Design a protein with these regions (language model features):
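Bacterial N-terminal signal peptides that target proteins for export
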Residues: 7-21
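Cyclophilin-like peptidyl-prolyl cis-trans isomerases
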Residues: 9, 33-323
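Bacterial N-terminal signal peptides
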Residues: 19-29
């Protein structure tokens, strides 16, 4: 009966059955493995140590960007499956060097770091856009589709009917409405906007550096996540102005450049790989975080929320698949 309740329409019945069975098996594993003495229960480190090269994937150079700061490099993976218009526009902005010389203008404690054109409100001084667009229609959510992978967490969520992971990104979905969307976990990247839903386009971007502000879900277009270098953003001095904006120009952090990795010589790239989220090993990883088996832990929660399952990233060890 539990599986039957998961059906939401006949056209998606097959993938819903498989999804429900996977969650059911994870839940059964949690019950059967509740005893610390269970030899089959693995720690997070043990799960990762058992991974094979096929459990990892290389980054797509065309959908990865580098934010270059004086302090170092921030690697951001883009999410064209969820925000194709914004991803294309951010890449267009990067390729016309729009971001070069702009600045991080906001660092709000336990919330976000944001970069933009400090002179955006001054017609004579604001940065010119050549071929990219200043604004776009919102991409707050997208339609469910059989070709979009989704590994569902078994423990429910407060903000959405279902949450899980899609190609490494934390996501949510509603089978009744047939919609899915990215969620605001630590390190997620979004496009700033004004009050109108279509007033953003990627010229202003922010990164979550605090407790997950899930109330922003489906109110802002999320278009990627930071894979490496988040500490360069989260450790910035906080802005003293309203909402954490820097009040003095000298407080801002200059942006050296934002580049699409495909445009950068291979010898200058940060060669990383990300744990796939559509494998049995990732299901094991979820279970190892739902019930922590490390010796330090004396109590297993038996559940997990979406933003407490970080997807591992490492320097590439396997032979990359050409992309």
């Amino acid at each position: 009966m539990v599986l039957l309740r998961d059906f939401w329409d006949s056209s998606h019945m097959t993938y819903r059955v498989l999804d429900s069975i996977a969650v059911f098996l994870v839940s059964i594993g949690a019950v059967c493995g509740a005893d610390k003495s269970d030899a089959k229960a693995l720690t997070v480190a043990e799960v990762l140590a058992s991974s094979k090269p096929s459990d990892w994937r290389p980054l797509d150079a065309e959908n990865t960007i580098y934010l270059e700061l004086p302090q170092g490099r921030v690697v951001i993976e883009l999410a064209p499956s969820f925000a194709p218009l914004h991803v294309a526009n951010v890449k267009a902005l990067a390729r016309e060097h729009y971001f070069d010389g702009l600045a991080i203008v906001r660092s709000q404690d336990n919330y976000v770091v944001q970069w933009a054109d400090p002179d955006a409100e001054k017609p004579d001084l604001k940065r010119k856009i050549v071929q990219a667009k200043a604004t776009l229609p919102p991409e707050f959510e997208r339609a469910l589709a059989p070709n979009i992978p989704f590994t569902r967490l078994p423990d429910g969520d407060v903000y959405a009917p279902e949450v899980g992971f899609s190609s490494g990104f934390p996501a949510a979905r509603d089978p009744k409405t047939g919609k899915m969307w990215l969620v605001h976990c630590y390190g997620m990247v979004g496009a700033g906007r004004d009050a109108p839903a279509d007033s953003g386009g990627g010229t202003e971007l922010y990164v979550v550096i605090g407790h997950a502000p899930r109330h922003l879900d489906r109110n802002v277009t999320l278009l990627g996540r930071v894979l490496q270098g988040i500490e360069l953003l989260s450790a910035l001095p906080r802005g003293s102005g309203p909402l954490g904006f820097y009040e003095k120009p000298e407080q801002r952090v200059p942006i050296k450049s934002i580049r699409v990795v495909a445009d950068i010589p291979a010898t200058e790239r940060s060669v990383l790989e990300v744990l796939r989220t559509d494998t049995p090993l990732f299901q094991q990883l979820i279970e190892s975080r739902r019930n922590r088996r490390e010796e330090w832990f004396h109590y297993q929660a038996g559940r997990i929320e979406i933003c407490n399952v970080p997807v591992p990233v490492r320097k590439q060890r396997s032979t990359p698949t050409p992309r």
